[in-house]
A protein has these predicted regions:
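Extended alpha-helical surfaces
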Residues: 1-223
Length: 223
């Protein structure tokens, strides 16, 4: 049995993450500095963090990855990571992804998507129920389905990240200086990074559009 290591120095060196999702305006520590802090991990724990980081970075690229590819990567993660807490966290992330994908498929009158068992089987069995009979465990399913009626992918991504944030924040209040606390910090940091990068990408596109518009007006002056 592996001994559980406490990481007082590591946790103490990490800047606090915001308590509220509304405060996710910037990452409190850069990826480079975070990597430096994580060098304090024991080798086995460092491997778990590496596998989690690789999976999370890979999973957040929906335009480049098919559901089948993500499931293969998820199976690989479970085979190679023996930390139960880390596996449970990634499993929950995949469950949320599967529910969102199922709601989209149903809206488009497609077949149920592949997903993580047993939730994929539950969804397929209850395909015609509004919340796939998952409402007791995931009370937000109906609201996500309602959001899909509109044309607001930004709001849907915000909801997905906020749901994950709330759960991780609750769990973080139960873990302090253990490796589990490090895992929870990484998961929450990744959400902050994803959200702030999304804002940065939007801002860059707006800036580029302003430049394009301005250049167009400039060209028209001499047209």
């Amino acid at each position: 049995m592996l001994l559980r290591t406490n990481y007082y120095t590591l946790i103490g060196s990490l800047p606090a993450l915001p308590r509220s999702f509304e405060q996710l305006d910037r990452v409190p520590i850069s990826p480079l500095k975070l990597d430096e802090r994580l060098k304090m991990l024991e080798p086995h724990d460092a491997r778990v963090i590496d596998e989690m980081s690789n999976f999370l970075v890979w999973e957040r690229q929906p335009l480049e990855q098919t559901d089948e590819a993500i499931l293969r990567r998820y199976d690989k993660f479970n085979r190679e990571v023996d930390n139960r807490f880390a596996r449970e966290l990634i499993s929950h992330t995949m469950a949320i992804r599967t529910i969102f994908a199922a709601l989209r498929c149903r809206r488009l009158q497609l077949a149920p998507p592949q997903g993580v068992a047993p939730i994929a089987a539950q969804i397929a069995k209850n395909w015609n129920h509004a919340d796939f009979r998952l409402g007791a465990q995931y009370p937000w399913v109906i609201e996500v389905d309602r959001q899909l009626n509109g044309d607001a992918p930004f709001d849907l991504e915000r909801m997905r990240i906020e749901l994950a944030w709330r759960r991780l924040h609750r769990l973080a209040e139960e873990h302090y200086f253990s490796f589990d606390a490090v895992v929870l910090y990484l998961m929450r940091w990744e959400l902050v990074y994803r959200w702030t990068q999304r804002d940065a990408d939007v801002g860059q596109r707006k800036f580029e559009q302003l430049v394009t518009d301005a250049m167009g007006e400039f060209a028209n002056m001499f047209g």
